[in-house]
């Protein structure tokens, strides 16, 4: 039994963007991978402009494959990687950290400087990888967040409305391990 069309891969950018353009599909995927209580997801524009010009560029910007905003304000970046790249993990960290900074800068521009840290929303990431990146891990899905190195206790931040959760969390879905 063939599980998917031989010439169409869900990791191709155009296919992935089509699949994740449906909010209910994106919400279900995030719910299953990150194990979050997701009521719905709004798909938002994925470009990340940077206010600082670099030598060869007038305005530097990056684009993530899919960016969703959840009902509680949490943002989730979904990045699809077909080829194994040596610095993918570095780039993925950059996307998440950059989104946190961009969100705080928006609050600052709105004049919310005294409450901008209270108003911050978590940013989570899911990387869908065609080829394994985490060779020492056996499972197809692996999740990471900040923890105490001795106790293993999660480092959670406080947010508006009394939320107490991780500020950053990442998950990797390695497709070549999925059917093993």
PLM feature segments, named:
Residues 1-180:
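Elongated, amphipathic alpha-helical interaction scaffolds
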